[in-house]
From Swiss-Prot:
Protein name: Envelope glycoprotein gp95
Region feature (Fusion peptide): 58-78
Glycan attachment residues as annotated in the record: 31, 93, 141
Species in which this protein is naturally found: Avian sarcoma virus (strain rASV1441)
Transmembrane segments: 193-213
Disulphide-bridged cysteine pairs: 50-86, 131-138
Length: 246
């Protein structure tokens, strides 16, 4: 340890591996993101039962909620974001279904047009006429973009699947932190974290609870002593024996 450390209390982060500073944490996160390893996350896709009724607050409600109850405002914002995501997923699914039905209709119309053209050509040949006898019959162009449309449908479905709900954020964080660990290890670490949180809460809250209980007991004892003192004073003032005073 240098005799003249520079940096105040934060200098401890430069002396031990267990307390890295902010720059070291950013470097570790940057190196882990460059590995390119995709880890499994506990993300579930939104289904048709989710609520898509978006009801945004007005300016007055937002201002009062932000000043008086910031936690309520944040919870309301998260709820509306979830409903907007549900609305977007349902809207994309409806759009994909509608475009798929239109593609089926266009395909059937295409087949009908080709059949009619074949019938017209057959009738013209049967009567000894060629396509040159009718203006515009020799050139027939019917474009087909079904393959491109199918690819775009697939892209739309992939984009919809990107919207999901992380049902186990702690487990996802542990998997991202420790790499490809098994589910049993994830459950074990979650149990250890839960126990650590409970112990920390007890360490933080137990002195306060003990102080409150001791204060109440001390107050009760003081009240009892004061009542007994007042009782003695009343006995001396009225000169009545203790046995006759109830």
């Amino acid at each position: 340890i240098p005799s003249r450390p520079v940096g105040g209390p934060c200098y401890l982060g430069k002396l031990t591996m267990l307390a890295p500073n902010h720059t070291d944490i950013l470097k570790i996160l940057a190196n882990s993101s460059r590995t390119g390893i995709r880890r499994k996350r506990s993300v579930s896709h939104l289904d048709d039962t989710c609520s898509d009724e978006v009801q945004l607050w007005g300016p007055t409600a937002r201002i009062f909620a932000s000043i008086l109850a910031p936690g309520v405002a944040a919870a309301q914002a998260l709820k509306e974001i979830e409903r907007l995501a549900c609305w977007s997923v349902k809207q994309a699914n409806l759009t994909t279904s509608l475009l798929g039905d239109l593609l089926d209709d266009v395909t059937s119309i295409r087949h009908a047009v080709l059949q009619n053209r074949a019938a017209i050509d057959f009738l013209l040949l049967a009567h000894g006429h060629g396509c040159e006898d009718v203006a515009g019959m020799c050139c027939f162009n019917l474009s087909d973009h079904s393959e491109s449309i199918q690819k775009k449908f697939q892209l739309m479905k992939e984009h919809v699947n990107k919207i999901g709900v992380d049902s186990d954020p702690i487990g996802s964080w542990l998997r991202g932190l420790f790499g490809g660990i098994g589910e049993w290890a994830v459950h074990l670490l979650k149990g250890l974290l839960l126990g650590l949180v409970v112990i920390l809460l007890l360490v933080v809250c137990l002195p306060c609870l003990l102080q409150i209980v001791c204060g109440n007991i001390r107050k009760m004892i003081n009240n009892s002593i004061s009542y007994h003192t007042e009782y003695k004073k009343l006995q001396k003032a009225y000169g009545q024996p203790e046995s006759r005073i109830v």
